[in-house]
Structure formats: structure tokens, C-alpha cells
């Protein structure tokens, strides 16, 4: 019994060090398959619906988050710079909050904005979100570029996507 206890105490720290600390997006550096429930609460938007050959921004947000609102405002004010980028905005909040958010920022008029609810709670664990908004950037070939947490200037995003 003492030998078992001794072996257990010796190998427990080794097993703890062997734990995987990398977020899934770092292990799988291409745009993941996803689906979000759109604000009409009946249709889905998936990664297959994105325009091919253009960069993608995945934005994890909350309609109640001030920084998320500032980021959305920065996007809409700089829409001419962002027209050739697909922007997927995902939240875990209820659809009615998404609907109100879309109306407030008039997001329906932008064809490159896709807003919905992550009903499968895929994105949070995939990116290990700590701060909102989280912006995950992918190039035109759908390869991972970088992640920004917190509101980020549009020019900094565009520089990263060059």
C-alpha cells in the first residue's frame, strides 16, 4: 500500500503538467464549422453560408456589453473599409435581445453582417472567451490569423488581416 501511495504522489504532478492548456482554436487553426440561430429564430447561418475568398471576423459579444456596443459602432462607422470582410456576430443571449441590438444599430442593411445566437454554446469554449467582445480573425483562405479581446480599432484589425 505504501508503494502505491508513493507512486501516486510521484506521478500526480507529472499528470498535472501533461494537461492540455491550449484553446481549441489554436489546435485547429482554420475556421471551424459552426451554426448560429438567426434573429428570426427559425433559420440558421453556418460557415457554409459565408462568401468564399474573403476574410472572416467572428465576434463573440453580448448585446448588453458596452465594449461590444462600441465595437459594433466602430464597425458600422467604418463599413466602407469592412465591405469585403464577413462579420459573424454570435452571442448566447436570447433572440429578442439580438433583434433589438440589430434594430438599434441598423445591422440589416449590411449584407456582410451575420448575427445570431450560439444555441450549442460552441464558440465560448472553443475560443475560451474571457473578455467581450472577442474578435477571431481568419484570412481569405479561412486560416486563423489572431484573436483580439476587448474593443479593437478597425485599422488594427485590417492591419492584421493584410
Task: Identify the residue ranges that each predicted region occupies.
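Bacterial Sec-dependent N-terminal signal peptides
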Residues: 1-23
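N-terminal "domain-start" segment that seeds a small globular fold
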Residues: 19-48
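Short active-site neighborhood of thiol/selenol oxidoreductases, capturing the structured segment around
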Residues: 46-69, 75
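Thiol-/selenol-based redox modules, centered on thioredoxin-like
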Residues: 54, 131, 137-162
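Solvent-exposed coil/turn segments that connect beta secondary-structure elements
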Residues: 63, 92-94, 120, 140-141
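Structural microenvironment flanking redox-active thiols in thiol-disulfide oxidoreductases
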Residues: 69-107, 122-125
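Short, internal strand/loop/helix patches
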Residues: 105-136
Amino acid at each position: 500500500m505504501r508503494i502505491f501511495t508513493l507512486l501516486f504522489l510521484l506521478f500526480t504532478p507529472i499528470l498535472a503538467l501533461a494537461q492540455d492548456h491550449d484553446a481549441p482554436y489554436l489546435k485547429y487553426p482554420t475556421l471551424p464549422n459552426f451554426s448560429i440561430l438567426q434573429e428570426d429564430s427559425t433559420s440558421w447561418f453556418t460557415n457554409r453560408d459565408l462568401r468564399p475568398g474573403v476574410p472572416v471576423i467572428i465576434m463573440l459579444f453580448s448585446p448588453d456589453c458596452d465594449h461590444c456596443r462600441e465595437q459594433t459602432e466602430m464597425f458600422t462607422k467604418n463599413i466602407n473599409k469592412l465591405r469585403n470582410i464577413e462579420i459573424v456576430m454570435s452571442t448566447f443571449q436570447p433572440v429578442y435581445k439580438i433583434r433589438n441590438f440589430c434594430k438599434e444599430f441598423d445591422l440589416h442593411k449590411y449584407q456582410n453582417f451575420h448575427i445570431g445566437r450560439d444555441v450549442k454554446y460552441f464558440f465560448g469554449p472553443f475560443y475560451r472567451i474571457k473578455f467581450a467582445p472577442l474578435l477571431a480573425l481568419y484570412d481569405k483562405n479561412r486560416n486563423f490569423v489572431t484573436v483580439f479581446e476587448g474593443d479593437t480599432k478597425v485599422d488594427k484589425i485590417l492591419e492584421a488581416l493584410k
